[in-house]
């Protein structure tokens, strides 16, 4: 018996099951009958849906936990609480290379899944690539409603990517090296001024990459490296991503979810809106400069967009601001995450740190000699960064696609149509079936020295795979090499005791990084 507002509910379904009914002076028999009818109908529909999901659904033969097969609530709970990546890894260890992680979704972590899900059109009768799951990427849509490079259709993606391709070419990145060096040099001097006092490396790295990205994207640095504490603008980026993911998972179960998402972000997505507005303001200033300066020779990203606007590839003003905001989000957060992870694992493996530091200092007599071209010749540095990308991928989560109506072959299995499918980075990279001792930081696995001959190195795709793979990988590699090279040339680095378990982190698509306290001691003679 349950009491609500002074009334009792009672209805006998059988001699074994009793449910109370509302009764009172204002409720007649028809109201009681209607209430009972709707209750029975609702329960019948609910249990029918649960039974269908578990035993009649087209994915019924794919393994996975019962709760995940019954309801999407299982997936949404783990994702909205930052636990999905580790849970998915756990499920793959238990159930194998394909797991049903929601009633309508499969996770893969082996074989040809990368190419089958994210590759070109080689195995699909429709001749089309698998499309992004629209609602999952709703959080990536810019607050102005414009779909950016991350959330656009194939057609729009190709057009936008074409505009930005020149900006991310090796030639363009090489032309920007002086800009990168200016910000990296300033970070080194700021850290040197601390005289070896433990400091949060996450903040320094994030501020450095954020200043680089704002300078490259908007023609003006945000100057966050000058801050002694976290710059609110830089910190807003992660908070905005977290808010968007949480909103998406809450609204999966709501009617009119697309309309409700817009209202929810306006009401509670303060960080995301503030970050976006700041990007818009600076983008407008940069575009105005280009309009008044006929000889606009700044080699930043905006210059390439402005040049494209004089051709048939033109982007609308709202598309420009939406994509610039995305560049600020992704361009700074992901590179800083990787570098922080790399520093952590280096300091936890002193013999690797000592070897890499010695090699860099032997190769360069002065910091002026350090450049991305020379650093690219250091195969051990490349191996260290590749291992960091494997064990601590900047984008930790999955990016789901939807199978076409006729279904698709994925890793040798037929998957029915209209099913979400994905590769989870953590589950792929930490699988003992793919990598020997997957939780150990071992750069040697990338050097072909035979230490782990069974490793499936091709399964590590930190920049994703296929036509929608990360367009900024050339810039990312330049930043990673330059920042790591300059830090290790200038400083002896040591992990502070309070950060011993720094890698025990939750994820909201990207890592929720706590402070990484490191002592940067100037090397002797510096």
From Swiss-Prot:
InterPro entries linked: Cyt_P450 (IPR001128), Cyt_P450_E_grp-I (IPR002401), Cyt_P450_sf (IPR036396), Cytochrome_P450_monoxygenase (IPR050121)
Subcellular compartments: Membrane
Catalytic activity, EC: 1.1.1.-
Co-factor(s): heme
Recorded topology in the membrane: Single-pass membrane protein
Pathway annotation: Mycotoxin biosynthesis
A GO CC term attached to the entry: membrane
Residues that, per the record, bind heme: 470
Residues bearing attached sugar chains per UniProt: 309, 418, 434
Key words, A-Z: Glycoprotein, Heme, Iron, Membrane, Metal-binding, Monooxygenase, NAD, Oxidoreductase, Transmembrane, Transmembrane helix
Gene3D superfamilies registered for this protein in UniProt: Cytochrome P450 (1.10.630.10)
Sequence intervals crossing the membrane: 34-56
Main location: membrane
An annotated Gene Ontology molecular function: iron ion binding
The UniProt record lists the keyword rRNA-binding: no
Similarity section: Belongs to the cytochrome P450 family.
Function: Cytochrome P450 monooxygenase; part of the 2 gene clusters that mediate the biosynthesis of fusicoccins, diterpene glucosides that display phytohormone-like activity and function as potent activators of plasma membrane H(+)-ATPases in plants by modifying 14-3-3 proteins and cause the plant disease constriction canker.
Stated name of the protein: Fusicoccadiene 8-ol C-16-hydroxylase
């Amino acid at each position: 018996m349950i009491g609500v507002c002074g009334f009792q509910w009672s209805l006998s379904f059988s001699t074994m099951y009793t449910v109370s009914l509302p009764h009172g002076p204002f409720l007649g028999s028809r109201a009681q009958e209607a209430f009972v009818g709707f209750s029975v109908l609702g329960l019948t529909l609910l249990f029918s849906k649960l039974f269908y999901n578990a035993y009649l659904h087209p994915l019924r033969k794919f393994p996975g936990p019962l709760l995940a097969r019954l309801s999407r609530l299982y997936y949404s709970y783990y994702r909205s609480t930052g636990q999905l990546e580790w849970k998915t890894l756990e499920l793959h260890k238990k159930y194998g290379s394909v797991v049903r992680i929601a009633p309508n979704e499969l996770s893969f972590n082996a074989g040809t899944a990368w190419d089958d899900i994210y590759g070109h059109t080689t195995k699909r009768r429709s001749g089309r690539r698998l499309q992004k799951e629209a609602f999952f990427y709703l959080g990536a849509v810019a607050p102005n409603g414009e779909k950016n490079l991350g959330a656009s259709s194939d057609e729009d993606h190709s057009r936008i990517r074409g505009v930005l391709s020149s900006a991310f070419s090796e030639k363009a990145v090489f032309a920007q090296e002086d800009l990168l060096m200016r910000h990296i040099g300033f970070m080194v001097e700021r850290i040197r001024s601390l005289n070896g006092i433990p400091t949060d490396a996450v903040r320094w790295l994030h501020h450095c990459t954020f200043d680089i990205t704002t300078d490259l994207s908007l023609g003006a640095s945000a100057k966050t490296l000058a801050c002694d504490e976290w710059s609110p603008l830089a910190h807003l980026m992660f908070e905005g991503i977290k808010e968007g993911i949480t909103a998406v998972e809450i609204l999966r179960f709501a009617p009119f979810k697309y309309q409700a998402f817009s209202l929810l972000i306006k009401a509670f997505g303060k960080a995301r809106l503030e970050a976006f507005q700041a990007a818009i303001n600076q983008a407008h200033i940069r575009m105005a400069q280009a309009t008044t300066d006929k000889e606009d020779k700044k080699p930043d990203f905006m210059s390439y967009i402005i040049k494209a606007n004089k051709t048939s590839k033109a982007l609308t003003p709202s598309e420009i601001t939406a994509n610039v905001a995305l560049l600020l989000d992704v361009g700074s957060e992901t590179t800083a995450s990787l570098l922080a992870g790399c520093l952590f694992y280096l300091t936890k493996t002193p013999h690797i740190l000592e070897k890499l530091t010695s090699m860099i200092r032997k190769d360069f007599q002065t910091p002026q000699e350090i450049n991305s071209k020379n650093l690219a010749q250091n195969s051990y540095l490349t191996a260290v960064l590749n291992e960091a990308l494997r064990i601590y991928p900047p984008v930790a989560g999955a990016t789901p696609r939807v199978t076409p109506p006729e279904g698709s072959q994925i890793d040798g299995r037929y998957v029915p149509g209209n099913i979400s499918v994905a590769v989870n980075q953590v589950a792929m990279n930490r699988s003992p079936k793919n990598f020997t001792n997957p939780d150990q930081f071992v750069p040697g696995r990338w050097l072909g020295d035979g230490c782990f001959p069974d490793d499936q190195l091709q399964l590590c795709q930190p920049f994703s795979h296929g036509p929608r793979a990360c367009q900024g990988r050339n810039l990312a590699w330049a930043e990673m090499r330059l920042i790591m090279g300059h830090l290790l040339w200038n400083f002896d680095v040591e992990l502070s005791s309070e950060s011993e378990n720094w890698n025990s982190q939750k994820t909201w698509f990207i890592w929720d990084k706590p402070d990484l306290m490191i002592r940067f001691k100037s090397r002797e003679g510096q």
